[in-house]
């Protein structure tokens, strides 16, 4: 169920689907995804598919975790990354093994509490958590070299653009329903460059009262 061979099959599939960053693939290989899903779904943890984690949220497909992480790191190592949507904590755990510090915002407190426990179990101690509205980012600790958003926004939140450091990279799904696109936004000297990448499907990025 969680054997090394099962994990190796997943890594081979991700490689065949186009992931190429050896460090990202190695981190996905060694990160125990079965710890981030309900015990009843642990037998599916190393399938390349999103899985429900409760509260109308999902743990992202491993390919998408790898894809977004590769995009974030494409220009080189990052020391300060903001994650919008802690969720299960799986993407957080992958990032924590690849960058110096992760600042993770989640609006559903029970999900974030579980994620904290999982990361502590894995001795990943370079993550700072905040229970809050992801649309607002985390201005007090910005700016950030990288920002990754794990839910689809109707449009790019201005607060996230404001909190992106010069040269910083924002990876975010944008759109509603079945019409969503993954964007890479880079803060340049005189503005932002936007690159439209893949068609994707994420749960919506909510705002308003916290849960």
Swiss-Prot record:
Gene Ontology cellular component list = cytoplasm
List where in the cell it is found: Cytoplasm
As its record notes, the protein acts as a catalyst of: [protein]-L-isoaspartate + S-adenosyl-L-methionine = [protein]-L-isoaspartate alpha-methyl ester + S-adenosyl-L-homocysteine
Keywords on record: Cytoplasm, Methyltransferase, S-adenosyl-L-methionine, Transferase
Among the GO molecular function terms of this UniProt record, one is: protein-L-isoaspartate (D-aspartate) O-methyltransferase activity
Where are the catalytic residues? Answer: 60
Family classification:
Belongs to the methyltransferase superfamily. L-isoaspartyl/D-aspartyl protein methyltransferase family.
What Enzyme Commission number(s) appear in the record?
2.1.1.77
Q: Which CDD domains match?
A: AdoMet_MTases (cd02440)
**Function according to Swiss-Prot or TrEMBL:** Catalyzes the methyl esterification of L-isoaspartyl residues in peptides and proteins that result from spontaneous decomposition of normal L-aspartyl and L-asparaginyl residues. It plays a role in the repair and/or degradation of damaged proteins.
UniProt keyword Glycosyltransferase present: no
Q: Which gene encodes it?
A: pcm
Per its UniProt record, what NCBIfam families does this chain match?
pimt, PRK00312.1
A GO biological-process term: methylation
Protein name (Swiss-Prot/TrEMBL): Protein-L-isoaspartate O-methyltransferase
**Among its keywords, does the record have Transferase?**
yes
């Amino acid at each position: 169920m969680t054997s090394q061979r099962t994990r190796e099959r997943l890594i081979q599939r991700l490689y065949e689907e186009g992931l190429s960053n050896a460090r990202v693939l190695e981190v996905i290989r060694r990160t125990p995804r079965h710890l981030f899903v309900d015990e009843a779904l642990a037998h599916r943890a190393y399938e390349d598919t999103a899985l429900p984690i409760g509260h109308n949220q999902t743990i992202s497909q491993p390919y998408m975790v790898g894809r977004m992480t590769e995009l974030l790191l494409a220009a080189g190592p990052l020391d300060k990354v903001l994650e919008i949507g802690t969720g299960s904590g799986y993407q957080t755990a992958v990032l924590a093994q690849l960058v110096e510090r992760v600042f993770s915002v989640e609006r559903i407190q029970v999900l974030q509490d579980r994620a904290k426990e999982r990361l502590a179990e894995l001795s990943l101690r370079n993550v700072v958590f905040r229970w809050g509205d992801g649309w607002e980012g985390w201005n007090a600790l910005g700016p950030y070299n990288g920002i990754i958003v794990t839910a689809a926004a109707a449009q790019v939140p201005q607060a996230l653009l404001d909190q992106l450091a010069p040269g910083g990279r924002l990876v975010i799904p944008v759109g509603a329903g079945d019409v969503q696109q993954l964007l890479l936004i880079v803060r340049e000297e005189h503005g932002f460059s936007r690159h439209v990448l893949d068609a994707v499907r994420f749960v919506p990025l909510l705002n308003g009262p916290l849960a």
